[in-house]
Amino acid sequence: NSEGLAEGIETRELPPYEDNPNIGDKGWRKLSLFNEKLADLEGTALFLDLDIVIRSDLTPFFEAEGEFLIVKDWDFPDDIIGNSSVFRFEVGKHPDVLENFYKLGNEIRHDYKNEQAFLSYEMDRKGILKYWSSDWCVSFKRNCLQPFPLNFFLMPKDPENAKIIVFHGRPTPEQAYKGFMGKGGLRYVKPTKWLDKYYQ
């Protein structure tokens, strides 16, 4: 749905995707980006989730060496799983990723927590899994929030060297800007007013 987008943003139809209601909504539709054809696009593509905040120029994300790069997931430091909020891939080069997803069918939910786990293991199997520099893409929850109880008194930190701030789960960027109280009251987020610098 392209309604409400700012003038000048070009859109394309989403690629075909065979929905499987038995595996739940874990972002699996992202895998449709690995169709052999992706609208009229070709070459290198950078995927960005909508619930991120861009702090600086994205050019380095296109200059980094590697065929497939993704954020190293903060929740799985001892696993190869990436966070698919920000990843780069070559359009049309990996249709087998989508094909393997379809082949697994309902079994996929037993072997993989979500789409980013499956994607990471597929790219590792192909020998091309690489991660962005850890200071490029940071987690708002892990890297910006003040530790308890300082979070009740101090605004979250603006990560000086980060290029992208990833908001996975709660709070969303909008919730963080206004202030947010998580379940149990411990994960309180003071209104994060410096976010407006990146929403010009």
Indicate where each model-derived feature is located.
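Conserved donor-nucleotide/metal-binding helix-loop-beta segment in metal-dependent transferases, i.e.
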Residues: 52-83
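Catalytic core and acceptor-binding pocket of nucleotide-sugar-dependent glycosyltransferases
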Residues: 95-200
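Short glycine- and hydrophobic/aromatic-rich loop-to-beta-strand nucleating segment
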Residues: 85-92
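Active-site-proximal specificity loops/subdomain of glycosyltransferases
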Residues: 1-42
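Catalytic metal- and UDP-sugar-binding loop of GT-A-like glycosyltransferases, i.e.
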Residues: 48
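Short loop/helix-cap segments at secondary-structure boundaries that form the rim of catalytic
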Residues: 2-11, 59-64, 79-80, 176-178
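Short, polar loop motifs at secondary-structure junctions
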Residues: 1-6, 54-59, 135-136, 170-171
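Short aromatic/hydrophobic "clamp" motif used to bind/position activated sugar donors
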Residues: 45
